Amino acid sequence: MANLKEIRDRIVSVKNTRKITEAMRLVAAAKVRRAQDQVLKSRPFADKLARVLENIQSRVQFEAVDSPLLSKREVKSISLVCITADRGLCGGYNTNIIKKVEIRYAELVKQGYQPNLILVGKKAIGYFQNRKDRYVIKSTFKELEQVPTVKDSEGVTNEILAEFLSENSDRVEIIYTKFITLVSCAPVVQTLLPLDPQGIAEENDEIFRLTTKDSKLLVEKSNIEKSDSEKLPSDIVFEQSPDQLLDSLLPLYLQNQVLRALQESAASELACRMTAMNNASDNAKELASTLNLTYNKARQAAITQEILEVVGGSVV
């Protein structure tokens, strides 16, 4: 059995570690709330933009519009946009998304396509750059804001547009972590280009808000109600041609999709970190309790031994 000083030092170390993990949990919880608020603030613009595109589509057949972002050509090369975190200590968040990318990459190679990677986040960059012999990396992005903004999405969107419009990539897919609940998230694959505005909807999403009660974190769940689509008047006359309208709106639409993926990934990362730090705090508490018990047993054994030695000496 370890001596009393070693056990006591380990108890102090575990308690200090618990203070750190508890602080990280609270910081992550606060940032999750900020990330969700950012998603809510961006919804009105995203929703209105989707409605405008739907209404234009009802007036104009997209198939008849000559827009490069809508053109579907023979697919040879596919770009995969991978979104991970810049930091660790968030459970299996980074590992799960990297595994998803590896599986999708292997599927595309097996199907005869030529995939390449656009990496967002230091974890993805570090992992795939160490495996350059197996993966083609087009570009990398790192050190984005923890709560992504429009500025963060611009660089990624511009790279995606450049690859697609130059025909270096015939299709662009984004792989990110969809935020489901505070304790549940899942890697998903979504096709970004060529665009299909009918495939986007944010209605009836569940929003999970963090609240406090009796000094404990609680979760409140609410649904986003479906918004009424405002139909454009049937006699409206567009000053610009449909091509000009869509050339202006579709890049905004694409950037909104990238921003949404970044925001959901950020919320998922923070939720995973909060859960991981909560588990670490619980484990530290349990370990400290076990060490205290071990310490008390060792101390009791030492006292008993001293008493026996004193009694034995007096008898002699």
Swiss-Prot record:
Q: Which residues cross the membrane?
A: none
> Has UniProt tagged this entry with the keyword Coiled coil?
no
Q: Name one GO molecular function term.
A: proton-transporting ATP synthase activity, rotational mechanism
Record membrane topology: Peripheral membrane protein
Q: InterPro entries, from UniProt?
A: ATP_synth_F1_ATPase_gsu (IPR035968), ATP_synth_F1_gsu (IPR000131)
Pfam families for the chain: ATP-synt
An annotated GO cellular component? plasma membrane-derived thylakoid membrane
Q: Where in the cell is it found?
A: Cellular thylakoid membrane
Major localisation:
membrane
Which UniProt keyword terms apply here? ATP synthesis, CF(1), Hydrogen ion transport, Ion transport, Membrane, Thylakoid, Transport
The similarity comment for this entry is: Belongs to the ATPase gamma chain family.
The family database entries (NCBIfam families) matched by this protein are listed as: ATPsyn_F1gamma (TIGR01146), PRK05621.1-2 (NF004145)
Q: How does it assemble?
A: F-type ATPases have 2 components, CF(1) - the catalytic core - and CF(0) - the membrane proton channel. CF(1) has five subunits: alpha(3), beta(3), gamma(1), delta(1), epsilon(1). CF(0) has three main subunits: a, b and c.
Function in brief: Produces ATP from ADP in the presence of a proton gradient across the membrane. The gamma chain is believed to be important in regulating ATPase activity and the flow of protons through the CF(0) complex.
- Name assigned to this protein: ATP synthase gamma chain
Task: List the source organism.
Answer: Prochlorococcus marinus (strain MIT 9301)
Taxonomic classification = Bacteria, Bacillati, Cyanobacteriota, Cyanophyceae, Synechococcales
